[in-house]
């Protein structure tokens, strides 16, 4: 889905398309990438959960859901604090603790997303493309102001962000900055790396053909 022109990497932004269509294409790629990122750890978690319960006799309560329908989040706090996976929660909070000594609770939020940016940057170093830390820093870093804005809204109005408006706000904010994050991984070579599903025929060929047809349709608009 990415385009070339970047050494060993690609980009989700097709410069040959008008800006609105170009951004629409990039956003769709970001959405599909997010669902893939959701599906892979979910599958791995399930593959561990089933034998742990059926064979080892562990209590299902020991294996709570890895995700809680993240697409239903009605605020950024809801998305990151509960609905997205919490595998690295303690690492992020520990990393945010130093800033809390200066900025209080806001420092924990800011520091946690800074740590997240660093960890995702480290994963990019395993790829062969153009690695740019600033994309992770801005992409994940901007989640903190969004959450702090929700807290400020609650303090001013006494109402929490939620409902349909909250859902729209959450999805727009995630997609705007998510584009930057996915672009960073695309430039680092994520879309060109070998994965377990590269030989998953005929599904792989079908997805590739659909992506090509979609690009042709976008250029025909």
Regions found by a protein language model. Name each.
Residues 141-150, 195-200:
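Alpha-helical transmembrane segments and their membrane-interface exit regions
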Residues 1-77, 81, 102:
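Membrane-helix and juxtamembrane interface regions of eukaryotic multi-pass membrane proteins
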Residues 22-45, 105-113, 131-143, 161-175:
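Transmembrane alpha-helices of multi-pass eukaryotic membrane proteins
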Residues 53-124, 160-221:
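Membrane-interfacial catalytic/cofactor-binding modules of polytopic membrane enzymes
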Residues 39-54, 148, 152, 176-184:
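Transmembrane alpha-helical segments that form the membrane-embedded catalytic/substrate-channel core
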Residues 2-30, 102-103, 121-138, 152-161, ...:
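Membrane-lumen (extracellular) interface motif
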């Amino acid at each position: 889905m990415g385009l070339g022109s970047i050494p060993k990497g690609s980009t989700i932004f097709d410069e040959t398309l008008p800006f609105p269509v170009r951004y629409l294409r990039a956003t769709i790629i970001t959405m599909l990438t997010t669902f893939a990122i959701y599906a892979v750890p979910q599958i791995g978690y399930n593959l561990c959960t089933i034998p742990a319960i059926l064979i080892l006799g562990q209590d299902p309560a020991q294996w709570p859901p890895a995700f809680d329908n993240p697409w239903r989040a009605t605020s950024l706090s809801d998305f990151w604090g509960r609905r997205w996976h919490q595998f690295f929660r303690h690492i992020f909070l520990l990393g945010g603790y130093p800033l809390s000594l200066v900025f209080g609770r806001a420092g924990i939020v800011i520091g946690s997303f800074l740590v997240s940016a660093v960890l995702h940057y480290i994963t990019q170093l395993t790829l062969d493309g153009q690695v740019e830390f600033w994309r992770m820093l801005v992409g994940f870093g901007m989640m903190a102001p969004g959450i702090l804005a929700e807290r400020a809204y609650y303090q001013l109005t006494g109402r929490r962000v939620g409902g349909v408006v909250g859902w729209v706000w959450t999805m727009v904010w995630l997609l705007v900055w998510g584009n930057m994050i996915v672009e960073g991984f695309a430039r680092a070579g994520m879309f060109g790396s070998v994965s377990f599903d590269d030989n998953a025929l005929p599904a792989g060929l079908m997805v590739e053909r659909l992506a090509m047809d979609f690009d042709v349709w976008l250029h025909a608009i």
